[in-house]
Amino acid sequence: MATLITSTTAATAASGPLVDYLWMLILGFIIAFVLAFSVGANDVANSFGTAVGSGVVTLKQACILASIFETVGSVLLGAKVSETIRKGLIDVEMYNSTQGLLMAGSVSAMFGSAVWQLVASFLKLPISGTHCIVGATIGFSLVAKGQEGVKWSELIKIVMSWFVSPLLSGIMSGILFFLVRAFILHKADPVPNGLRALPVFYACTVGINLFSIMYTGAPLLGFDKLPLWGTILISVGCAVFCALIVWFFVCPRMKRKIEREIKCSPSESPLMEKKNSLKEDHEETKLSVGDIENKHPVSEVGPATVPLQAVVEERTVSFKLGDLEEAPERERLPSVDLKEETSIDSTVNGAVQLPNGNLVQFSQAVSNQINSSGHYQYHTVHKDSGLYKELLHKLHLAKVGDCMGDSGDKPLRRNNSYTSYTMAICGMPLDSFRAKEGEQKGEEMEKLTWPNADSKKRIRMDSYTSYCNAVSDLHSASEIDMSVKAEMGLGDRKGSNGSLEEWYDQDKPEVSLLFQFLQILTACFGSFAHGGNDVSNAIGPLVALYLVYDTGDVSSKVATPIWLLLYGGVGICVGLWVWGRRVIQTMGKDLTPITPSSGFSIELASALTVVIASNIGLPISTTHCKVGSVVSVGWLRSKKAVDWRLFRNIFMAWFVTVPISGVISAAIMAIFRYVILRM
């Protein structure tokens, strides 16, 4: 009893002078929310960037799922890492007689980290939130107490983890993807093995997640009181239960869905629906390209030389299926200048007459584009190509715009891979698109548009745009000497960065369906781990600020309050909804092409690495883990599938973030110490 009275008196005496620092506490809460906002805007792409980029979920769905799992993860897993950020980097005992200086340092650290992360988010540059807060914490400590205030041994461990985390995550992702590819993807019929593996994948995901929560993730909820055998038993039991649910309910439903997709042949698919508007006996009047070349000059092909009884084909999307490297050059669909070589039938709305005698019915929007520009292209899409796989699960679901946009009214987005990707598929002319948008965002459009005829400088593009640049070539009227130009051959593609080698190892449509929900699950797992690890970046200094003000003890043993973790989780969610789209577009596409199977391997292995690090109290970067996994899996698929220039820039940013945030924090701390507090 005497000890309790003594400690209470000491706390009261210590907290008395700190009432004067209430303004600093309020300022700290405001800056902490801004910091959490910046964390959500920048780092959330690590969790759902690949899922949104591959079209598995829309941006709105990703925001909803991430809001739930980020918040839950921040509450259940965030306390452990907050302790490391709060007391592991600096010697807080040196601030026993200068609590106000430690509070000012916490505000300075949050300010320095928030400013740099907001700038990086505005520039769509993915950086590490952990790097920011570590550098900012060291920056204010150097100003306040000099080199003696920093635990350099702990800093060395953290710096080592920055290199170890992408390496470990990359190795784990590579091993997992190698097993998936060997036992599922490379099988003649991957569906049986994939269905057998589903319960295992779900069980591992759920079991690991529950174990991380109960082992050390949520001490305030009482999970830390469970014995080790109890934690293992509960985790294994829940994992087995989940596996049974998946085996008896999910697998049969998935099998039926895949069978329906397989039975639906490509020609019967709504994606390439073809309707014959005339009777079958009129099909004999169709002319082949070879007949036209032999009997008539191509430039004279028109309504006068082609019978009007030709079959009118209505295609939702203008492309043809072909087998990889099997279609002879003469059978490839030509690139046509509609102003010179074809005629638009006035009797049929939007019907275009091709050199082979067929009339192709286009939608009103496409017809307007044809009439205004006169350019429209057909492309052969090979069944084994990555473009074909992407078509099946994007265009077939009619959500190309929804994947990265808000509604179907705006299916084409400027300055991202979907714009060039969709326009290349549909053969839409880029000239009109450039004319409308080039004046406003000329610099951004350089990443999107093809080079002009007079310029031979190759413009760097992302992987999707490079691939479309390889399979399509927009010709102007002055460049066309002949009426029909054959599509680029495979030999011409091999010399470009958009080589088909990047797309050789692609998921089959049924495999994509198999892994789509798994990728969503692993994205949720990654979001949960991200919330547990990165909420400490925003709340760690705020916890130190609040506990010093509340208890007057710089080395308080009080556990991190749950409501503070929840406060940080809410800030992360707000940042995700407002600015999350910017970095998601960068991380979800540009580093390497992602398929559902590779995305599953990337997300599960990187999330497992982050969760393990969170439970041992080591603040690692989720950005590093995800980048390491993406590069590892992309390198296994094809060395050319990785944008090594972008990887180099990201790697350089890892070193720049720490000193920049540290300098900003040190400057603010100097103002506090020498101008405001005069301590």
UniProtKB/Swiss-Prot annotation:
Residues 550-558 are annotated as: A. It catalyses: 2 Na(+)(out) + phosphate(out) = 2 Na(+)(in) + phosphate(in). GO terms for cellular component: membrane; plasma membrane. The modification Phosphoserine is found at residues 265, 269. It is found in: Cell membrane. Disulfide bonds: none annotated. Belongs to the inorganic phosphate transporter (PiT) (TC 2.A.20) family. Sodium-phosphate symporter which preferentially transports the monovalent form of phosphate with a stoichiometry of two sodium ions per phosphate ion. May play a role in extracellular matrix and cartilage calcification as well as in vascular calcification. Essential for cell proliferation but this function is independent of its phosphate transporter activity. (Microbial infection) May function as a retroviral receptor as it confers human cells susceptibility to infection to Gibbon Ape Leukemia Virus (GaLV), Simian sarcoma-associated virus (SSAV) and Feline leukemia virus subgroup B (FeLV-B) as well as 10A1 murine leukemia virus (10A1 MLV). This is Sodium-dependent phosphate transporter 1. It comes from Homo sapiens (Human).
